[in-house]
């Protein structure tokens, strides 16, 4: 078996429409496949990765001790990483910086409380 990349991440959201608006306006995702599946799920794209937004709660999936940890997005460059921090501050979104030695990351939450990371290996 040969796999290439993650195709999409599916999220359960209290309000998929509000979550979509946040990902589009805050992180630059694009709303795609708008005329498919009666709008469920809402599909967003960033580069070659998709998010599928389903109605429901954070606990909608059944789990045996596992669960969603976070979604990491890679900045194109260190200046883009710095720009992301400025953009989040401008929008009043708090974040936490971490130096992982091989990368730098910032962590913050989306409107449904899911943890997001923006990272760069361009040190």
Regions flagged by a language model, labelled:
Residues 1-2, 85-123:
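Vicinal oxygen chelate
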Residues 54-58, 120-123:
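Acetyl-CoA-dependent GNAT
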């Amino acid at each position: 078996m040969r796999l290439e990349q993650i195709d999409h991440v599916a999220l359960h959201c209290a309000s998929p429409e509000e979550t979509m608006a946040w990902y589009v306006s805050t992180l630059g995702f694009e709303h795609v496949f708008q005329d498919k599946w009666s709008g469920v799920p809402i599909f967003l794209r960033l580069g070659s990765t998709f998010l599928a937004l389903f109605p429901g709660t954070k606990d909608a999936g059944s789990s045996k001790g596992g669960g969603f940890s976070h979604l990491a997005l890679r900045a194109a460059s260190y200046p883009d990483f710095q720009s992301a921090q400025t953009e989040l501050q401008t929008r009043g979104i708090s974040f936490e910086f971490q130096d992982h030695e091989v990368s730098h990351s910032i962590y913050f939450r989306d409107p449904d409380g899911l943890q997001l990371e923006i990272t760069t290996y361009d040190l």
